[in-house]
Design a protein with these regions (language model features):
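Acidic anion/phosphate-binding donor-loop and adjacent secondary structure
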Residues: 27-28, 105, 111-114, 120-137, ...
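Membrane-proximal helix-turn-helix segments that form the acceptor-binding/catalytic region
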Residues: 35-93
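Carbohydrate-associated surface elements
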Residues: 99, 119
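A conserved mid-protein helix/loop that constitutes part of the nucleotide-sugar donor-binding site
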Residues: 140, 149-166, 185-186
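Nucleotide-activated donor-binding/catalytic signature segment of Leloir-type glycosyltransferases, i.e.
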Residues: 187-209
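Aromatic "clamp/platform" in nucleotide-sugar-dependent glycosyltransferases that forms part
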Residues: 229
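Short hydrophobic beta-strand element within catalytic cores of glycosyltransferases
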Residues: 237, 245-249
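A charged, aromatic-enriched C-terminal amphipathic alpha-helix characteristic of glycosyltransferases
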Residues: 280-317
């Protein structure tokens, strides 16, 4: 639904819309320019030819204004609003968690919504990471996987790192995530925060890492920390759990539907206490149990769930 498309022939019997979370509604209602830029990829180009008419690569992010001003903003949002509202009202809705389902109900007043969690490549993370782990003593990294974006609240991870370093917990923290050019300023702020808190020897960033690189870091890790409060689902958390990492997550959002309560925190200080306990008292068998607990998020389970929804739609059409 983040890039809404609507056709007049759509109905709840012949169209399915996956709604991750009703964020698009609020972006459109508030006429959020950043939504046009980051979600829809719309930018107002700078001059694409230099004074001497030399060709300039218009696909180079450096040649785009970082804060576009759209002269036809009202028109864009009217079109989006028409398409989005009709799409949501005239299709069968699927979302990723009960947390997201409740948010959609509050936004649209419709309660006929299916919950189908996205599939996780469990075997890749379980076989390559968990089964390859050696002695627990060598796996002391705290891992964060997140896009480098302001709403992901990466600063919470940095605050946690400060507490853990001061208490001599873990060998360090690694933050792995993709970075897009329009969040370069935020990334610079995070790096400055690391410098100011004296964490350059404890916390490192791995930007735009490959899957092989990510799996290599997972092999070094024991705990996964999730910094964002109110996460809608959290695929990275499940991938880490598949690899046998202990998840430490906020006690609000879709994550609470599958992360054991003893690993949920309300404050950064509580998160630090949980991690200290994991490092000093938790046996390796608990990591294996965590990995085995997420089989319901497999590809095969997702396919079965989606087929069930399709069969219900087809049976309605036959009536």
């Amino acid at each position: 639904d983040a890039s809404p498309y609507y056709h007049s022939c759509f109905s709840k019997d012949n169209a399915i819309t996956y709604c991750h979370f009703p964020s698009t509604k609020y972006h459109i209602d508030s006429e959020n320019i950043d939504y046009l830029k980051t979600d829809l990829g719309m930018t107002e180009r700078s001059n694409v030819f230099s004074d001497n008419k030399d060709y300039v690569d218009i696909n180079n992010p450096k040649n785009c204004k970082t804060k576009p001003q759209f002269s036809r903003r009202k028109e864009y949002f009217e079109i989006l609003k028409y398409g989005y509202w009709n799409l949501m009202r005239n299709s069968t809705l699927i979302t990723n968690s009960e947390f997201s389902r409740r948010a959609i109900v509050n936004a649209f007043g419709s309660d006929n919504i299916y919950v189908l969690s996205p599939p996780i490549d469990i075997e890749t993370f379980r076989n390559v990471a968990l089964m390859a782990n050696g002695d627990d003593e060598t796996n002391d990294i705290i891992l964060v996987i997140s896009r480098i974006a302001p709403h992901k609240k990466i600063e919470n991870a940095i605050k946690l790192a400060k507490i853990l370093k001061d208490n001599n917990v873990s060998k360090g923290m690694k933050i792995v995530g993709n970075l897009y050019y329009y969040f370069f300023d935020y990334y610079s702020e995070l790096k400055q925060m690391v410098l100011d808190l004296g964490l350059t020897d404890y916390l490192t960033f791995e930007i735009n890492a490959s899957l092989d690189k990510l799996l290599s870091i997972i092999r070094e890790s024991r705990v996964y920390f999730h910094p964002m409060i109110g996460e809608h689902f959290g695929m990275a958390v499940l991938e880490a759990m598949a690899a046998g990492l202990i998840p430490v997550v906020p006690n609000e959002g879709g994550l609470t539907e599958f992360v054991p309560q003893e690993y949920q925190f309300n404050t950064i200080e509580q998160a630090a206490e949980i991690i200290m306990h994991v490092f000093t008292h938790l046996p390796k068998t608990e990591r294996i149990k965590i990995s085995n607990d997420i089989n319901k998020f497999s590809n095969s389970h997702y396919i079965e769930g989606f087929q069930t929804i399709l069969n219900e739609l087809l049976s309605r059409r036959r009536k």
